Each structure stands twice: as structure tokens, then as C-alpha cells.
Amino acid sequence: MAKRIGKILLGIFAAFLVLIVGYVAYMQIQYYRIDDFTKLATENPQTEQVQKGKAYRIMTYNIGFGAYSADYSFFMDTGEMLDGTKTVGKHARALSEKAERENTEGSLNLVKSQEADFIFTQEVDEKADRSYQVNQREIFQKGLSGYGSVFANNFHSAYLFYPFLEPHGAVQAGMLTFSKYQILENTRRQFPVSDAFITKFTDLDRCFLVSRLPVDGGKELVLIQVHLSAYDKGGLIRAEQLALLNEVLAREREQGNYVIAGGDFNHDIAESIESFPSGQKTPEWVYQLDSDDLADGYRFAKAENAAEIPTCRGADIPYEKDVTYTVVVDGFIVSDNIEAKAENIDGGFLYSDHNPVVMEFTLL
């Protein structure tokens, strides 16, 4: 009897081991990184050209794949309350398909209300289990039908069977750049990313999207949408990413182009680490960047209301004003031949764990 039980247990263990090895092999076979310098087409291309001396509006907004209503927390986020209580997020997917659609439409309406000429959006799901297969890319492109758009995939993962009771699933997601003006060319540039065994399967395929727009007089307006790494202990990968971005910024300035780089920097870009009331300690992932960290001739266009309105909340707990940790990580870098004035928009974190940022600018 004991031998029979032992054989059964051994068989169960062997089956489990085969399952694990098979799953790891599946993840490895499915794993890939998109090539650097990948050219991307503009959908619904526009024809009007950008002009010097004219005022324009640009917006950036991380829509958080439609999951982050105020009552949402994310399983990968951790934190600590001021009293030392450890916190960890709960969910790997949106709360429901209904909530997913409501948040996506809410974010779209918030974007449309700002009447921007150019729009950067991050964490836009195209086909993902975490968002119940709701195609946010299609919804935004249809809702912003008067714009040309380009999509850069920066998250393509095989089915992640974790957490076990609510698997994150497979994901195809990325960044969308919208423009009411003519785009000559789009190039997806690959950021350095971690190749650690587990991290490479779960982290984004980080990139930045470079879009070139003709300007009267022969120069170009170069729009660069970015989404830098957040989960990087020691900041080594983020330092490499910033170095590459600065290399590109410097090259464009040497050519006399107008440059705006914007998006989710996942760094404090407004000296806001301790600006807002909070019942939580400052998270480990919050690093500070300022204009001194940028290539010569560039600056962060700090929002005039950056001390009053944060752009990102911690997602380790549901959002509660003055309790959940908040900081400014979204915004724009501008070259010194651009006059710019930015404003953080108070969206109340109703549809995303981010608030939008809008910037008015003029090419000098």
C-alpha cells in the first residue's frame, strides 16, 4: 500500500515537473524583442504642416490599460504605510469588462476635452486578457478620427499564469501618438531592457517612438513619445535608457530641429517626491530627474501647477486623496528653440492611475 501511494505521489510530482518545464519552454519560445529602428506607418495621415510662430497644444496621458479606477490596485505594486504596514496590490486584470469599457471611454472623453493638436497615450491595450480583449487602440483611433495615428507595441507577452487565481494572461499593448498635422516618418527605437530570467517575460519591451513632422522653413518638429522603466532596482537600466534618449536628443539639436519628448518618465520630473500629503512612505521606485540630467539645450517643461496636481498615484492600494502616495512623473522635455507652458490636468484618478498633462508650445 505504501509503495502504491509512493508511486502515485511520484507520478503527480513528475507530471507537475513536466508541466513546469513545458510552461517555461513555452514562455521562452514565445519570447522576442522587436528590432531597433523599426519603421511604423501613420494611419489616417494628415496633410497640413506645422508652422513656426503658431501656438499648438500637446497632451500626454497614460491610460493604464483601462483598469485603474479609483478602487483598483495592481498585484505587482507594493508599498508601505507611515505606520510601517506593508501593502500590496490585489488585481492582475481590470475589475470587469464593464469597468474596462467605462474607464476606456472615460479616458477618451478626457483626452477629447483638451482639444490638443498632438496626443501621446501609453498603456493602450490592443488584445489582452487583462483588459477582457477590449481593443483600446481601435476605440481611441475611432474616437479621434480627425487625427493621424501611429501605434508602437511595447508589451507583447505570452500567457502569464500568475497570479494563479487571476492570471494576467497574454498581452499585446503599446503607445499611440496622434497628430492633426502631417507626419513624414515614424521610427520605433528600442530601449535597453532587463534580460533577467523572470523579468524579461513580465516587463515591457520598452521603446520610444520618434515621429518627424515637416516645418515651414525646412526643419522638422520631432515628437518623441517615451515610457521609461519603473521596476529597476539600482536604476541601472533606467540610466542606460536615459543615456540613449539623451544621445538622440543631442543629435536632433545639432541638426537644428525642434524637439518635444513626452510621456510617462516613471521618474519624479518636478521635484515632487514629497510635495503631496500622503499616508504612505515614498516608494522605492521613485527616482528624481531634472533638467541637469538632460542633453545640453533641453529642459523639462515643469507644469505651473505641479505643486498642486500630481500625475501618478501608487497602485498598491485603492486611491484615497491625501492617503495614497502621489507624484509627478508625466510631462514633457523641450528643446531651447521652443517656448512652452505646461499644465497638469486634475482627472481625479477616476479612469487611470495617471492624470494627463497638457502643454501649449510655439516653435521660435
Give residue ranges: language-model regions.
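Active-site beta-strand/loop signature of hydrolases that rely on acidic residues for catalysis
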Residues: R57-I63, K90-R93, N103-Q133, F178, ...
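Short proline/glycine-enriched turn/loop segments at secondary-structure junctions
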Residues: I198-K200, P318-V323, D346-L350
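N-terminal, active-site-proximal structural segment of metallo-dependent hydrolase catalytic domains
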Residues: K3-K142, N153-Y162, E166-Q172
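Metal-dependent phosphoesterases centered on the DNase I-like endonuclease/exonuclease/phosphatase
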Residues: D232-D336
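Surface-exposed cleft-lining segments at the edges of enzyme active sites
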Residues: K90-S96, V124-A128, F191-K200, H227-L236
